[in-house]
Amino acid sequence: MTTPTTRKDLMIVNMGPQHPSMHGVLRLIVTLDGEDVVDCEPILGYLHRGMEKIAENRTIIQYLPYVTRWDYLATMFTEAITINGPEQLGNIQVPKRASYIRVIMLELSRIASHLLWLGPFMADIGAQTPFFYIFRERELIYDLFEAATGMRMMHNYFRIGGVAADLPYGWIDKCLDFCDYFLTGIAEYQKLITRNPIFLERVEGVGIIGGDEALNWGLSGPMLRASGIEWDLRKVDHYESYDEFDWQVQWQREGDSLARYLVRIGEMTESIKIIQQALEGIPGGPYENLEIRRFDRLKDPEWNDFEYRFISKKPSPTFELSKQELYVRVEAPKGELGIFLIGDQSVFPWRWKIRPPGFINLQILPQLVKRMKLADIMTILGSIDIIMGEVDR
């Protein structure tokens, strides 16, 4: 009888691209020494659709329906960045009411994105129950979106100089009711998850990123704020009307998966505070800057003539992008979503470079999982929060 020999060689395992916990079509080639991870190589590109090249052959209004397919769980942010660039290039003023509506929609979208991060993240580490709970609240947000925009997911709601339609009658009261209800929902999650000993065993001290390391890797969003860096573009860049509301930047010092969870839970509470203040203080007035429909076509336009009042309000504006370059960014749920835009005195952008937060946050994954256990890969990957639509573009 021969004695079995122990294996000394390393094992290479494929995770994905159709693995249910991969959050899209991400493929990881993992090198294992028993249960220990020796190396991990992410393979991208399965969801590449040429979004940057498409942008260079479309006007801004034609391109708006495409951008909701980057991060398809937080579509308001991709729309916001797409119209913020041309607005800054053309120095277009946004009415106060439109700015408040945008803030409300952006924060609702942030909550919906964080909820759909929380459920699968908990399922990844073995807790099935929250996965079903989060859909309860998320459906209420989608009901609000549907009432205001007509669409549950790909909203196509933002426009250059405002939004596509005003809030319908009764929407503000319905949204305030949701805010009151959702605060009790967050308290329920805190009770169910935050002090759960099994949950803490799985996430505490797993995937630690220091502050300097986070800056060197170019991380942003909850990944950066969980590492002790108090950096939020809503406070830094003063875009939309965020300066008019009282809210706090959520951050933690530890830099592990638990800290990233706590930052996102805290952000949902702060988003509710912003929404409540915006709903209670929303001013009257127009929801769209109608003057930009003319886009400098006429030197002395007649504001009250028949064509302006009845014809030129709704057609797609042929907005010429002036010959300059610009970088605009917003604080998306996953981090800094930016666009580098080069105009060429044409209706099409000459260059449209997307800076997706998920793509840059994902770069640190191989370093985080080295010398960890195989089961910790799902915890760390889940805590990064990626959507392959924006990673591959």
Swiss-Prot record:
One of the Pfam families matching this protein, by short name: Complex1_49kDa
Entry's Gene Ontology BP terms: photosynthesis, light reaction
UniProt xrefs under InterPro entries: NADH_Q_OxRdtase_suD, NADH_UbQ_OxRdtase_49kDa_CS, NDH1_su_D/H, NiFe-Hase_large
Alphabetized PROSITE patterns for the sequence: COMPLEX1_49K
GO annotations of cellular component type: chloroplast thylakoid membrane
UniProt keyword annotations, A-Z: Chloroplast, Membrane, NAD, NADP, Plastid, Plastoquinone, Quinone, Thylakoid, Translocase, Transport
Membrane topology: Peripheral membrane protein
Cell location: Plastid, Chloroplast thylakoid membrane
Coiled coil spans: none
Presence of the UniProt keyword Lipid biosynthesis in the record: no
SUPFAM superfamilies per the UniProt record, alphabetical: HydB/Nqo4-like (SSF56762)
Enzyme Commission number(s): 7.1.1.-
GO molecular function, one term: quinone binding
Family under the similarity heading: Belongs to the complex I 49 kDa subunit family.
Protein role: NDH shuttles electrons from NAD(P)H:plastoquinone, via FMN and iron-sulfur (Fe-S) centers, to quinones in the photosynthetic chain and possibly in a chloroplast respiratory chain. The immediate electron acceptor for the enzyme in this species is believed to be plastoquinone. Couples the redox reaction to proton translocation, and thus conserves the redox energy in a proton gradient.
Record protein name field: NAD(P)H-quinone oxidoreductase subunit H, chloroplastic
Organism encoding this protein: Atropa belladonna (Belladonna)
